[in-house]
Every structure is written in C-alpha cells, then in structure tokens.
C-alpha cells in the first residue's frame, strides 16, 4: 500500500461522493494476450493501461483514504457492492488521490503504477464482422 493523506472536508478539489471506476480489457485479444502471458510465466502480471478501458463508473461515500483503510478488514466487493472479474482493475478517486486495485487469483493487490488516465482514453474494440 502506498502512503495516503486524509483529505480535509473543506478541500475544494474533493469529490463527494468519490468516483469508482472499473476498468476491463479493451478487446478480447488483449484479454487473451494477458491470460496467455500469465500462464506462460506461471505467475500473475500487473495490468498494462494500454490494454484496458473504462467499463463502468459508480459512486462511493468513502474517500480514497477511508477506502484504503477499510479494504484491510472488509472485502473490496462488499465495500463497492459489485462483483469484479479476474484481472479487472478498480479505482476509487476522491478528487485528490486514487486507490487502484487489481484483481488476481489470490485477491486484490495495489496497482499504483496503473495509468488510469491512459486507460480512460482507450476505447473498447468492437469485433470485426466477418466478410
């Protein structure tokens, strides 16, 4: 976990409620490449923003600091009231700082190097129709 600061209530940059952004693979090919790489290496690899895109946005009454504290004792999916698939990425953003978690076979792990802004610029690739 990385060190976070408690954002004061009076901070003008603070967003209430916080945003929960869920990222998924931008294409089936990106998902397959990721899965095959994990299998061939025999271990999980971190998420690469160029392979992901924003799939859903929700709201959360906790700020990033409180969320990071609570996930130590409460399951992520219970806090967010959502079921996430393997290798999805979730970001809780309160306007000042983010907590980014990556779902692995062993549970959620922090993914502070995931470039969420880059992933939000990507678009989901549509399947090409067969000619």
List each model region and its residues.
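Short intrinsically disordered terminal tails
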Residues: 5, 125-131
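Short, conserved turn/kink motifs that form compact alpha/beta structural patches or helix kinks used as
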Residues: 43-94
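Intrinsic disorder/low-complexity segments
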Residues: 50, 112, 120, 130-131
